[in-house]
Amino acid sequence: MKQLFLVLFAAFSISQLAACLLENRRWRAINKPFLMLTLLLWYCAAAQQVNPLFAAGPALSLLGDVLLIFHGLFKFGGTAFFGAHLCYIAAFWRNISLRQPLWLLAALGYMLVVGFVLHTVRSGMKKKMFALAVVYLSALSAMSFSALLQFVSVGGAAALVFAGSLLFVASDSLIALREFRRDIPIPKPYFLVMATYIPAQLLIALGMSWLG
């Protein structure tokens, strides 16, 4: 059964990327919810031991994907993904040891990245939206930072999770630029967002299915 779910995820992923390339908005909207649905089903079937904290991440991402289809629900979609990042953080921290000194330098690096993204998009945001962006990007960077600490602590499959987290940061940074800095041209922005988001979620799920 897990092979079937993975094949379905791959098929919906290819379909979504094609819809983005062809700029077919209706096709994108119909196809999008099936990405996280099939990935979540695959994780539950493939994991040696299903981690409920982690499984809540793809579930909330599915909710976020559905909400973001509708333009008026952007904040609600962002809130769902904010919750997904918190679930990922909680799941990653079960495998983390802070005995490695790398975490201090890594924390500084993530702060610089968040600061750069916020500085870039600030001119296109109202104050309230900017405050929400600060909170969201802090959670996103904390998720990726936690994935790095997990990799430093346990190695192995945690490398996939960390790589996925970096792609997630890239994907959400592209969304921020697309929504709030339209003066910066991004070729095929929907395609680039999904081309980073899809492998991000897949790598995170693959790694966590082995780590437990």
Model feature map: region roles:
Residues 1-212:
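Polytopic alpha-helical membrane-helix bundles and their juxtamembrane interface segments
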